[in-house]
Amino acid sequence: IKNYKNLRELSIDSLARVNLIVGCNNVGKSTLLEAVSIYLANGNDEWLKTILDFRGEMVNVDSAKGDVDFSQVLSEHYSSLFSGRKMDFRNATAISIGEQSDLLNIKLVHIAEEQRGGTIVRWVYNDDDADSGEHLFRYIGDGLSVVSGSNAPMLIPFFRRGFPGNVKDRVPFENVLPQDFHLRKNVLLFDRISLSDREGYVLDALRIIEPSIDRLNFLNENEYSNRRVPFVTLKDTGERVRLSSMGDGINRILTVILALVNCKGGVFLLDEFETGLHYTVQTQLWRVIFMLSEKLNVQVFATSHSHDCINSFIAVNRGGQIIRLDNRGGEIVAVNYSDDKEMEFIAQNGVEIR
């Protein structure tokens, strides 16, 4: 990962099926997950805007309030993705994510427009093109060029509001943030796996906190609303209970596991594993995550700065690894822990690896 926010040049030697990313505050754990998600989304403009919105960097501009320089506004928005919030036209400052053989690159470019056989074509140009005289084009503004592997560049112009792109994800992936307890998206995620064996995995996870749960469904919250919310029935009484009344922990587990089981053959990203979870249930949830990651072929990236989370991960580890991010003189470096004996020593001696 190169030139993405505070990750000027981060290399991770190896990855496991389940990866726990640890480190002190503001070292770049969440930033690492963001970079992975951008790679998985093939740099899709809509996903970039979603990330900017998550971080409060995307401002909705009301054009009715007067002249709005969208080029300036969008340039400021997207510059927050680059190291030092600075982007220029040099390759040296471009964002790069991925393996050397299959990089995703994002850089600032000039965008030109010309007529080709009755069709208006937009493309990236440089000063050599302007000097050569080979093209009859006009410069129409600046923007981002996103190149994924050997694919043609996708252009994100700053001079107008963009339209939703038609860029497909590399693989299925879901991203769960610390504040995600009652996602509206959960309804869609549940519908995708309803009546399949994956619905059973969700129920098993909820039983970590409430063993008497029998069934789960998303129902209209009342007769006056079309909004669907999760309800469960209890084995002993048959009573139907709204899940939101059972506490944050069980709702967090629902969000986590619904997202995970929708990533079959893909990647699951979980920021701050321990959020909303009492330490007594963390080991059981890790056990479920390890089982599902293997059964559904899902690669997992989770972050934490909690000793309870780290120790519970180590207690049930099955081929996973811990990646510690360190700030060494302003440069973020990664240290991998994957050896079982090494992890056992960490757990038994309380070694500081956060």
Predicted features by range, described:
Residues 42-255, 323-324, 328-354:
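Phosphate-coordinating catalytic segments in nucleotide- and nucleic-acid-processing enzymes
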Residues 1-50, 237-353:
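Switch/communication elements of ASCE P-loop NTPase nucleotide-binding domains
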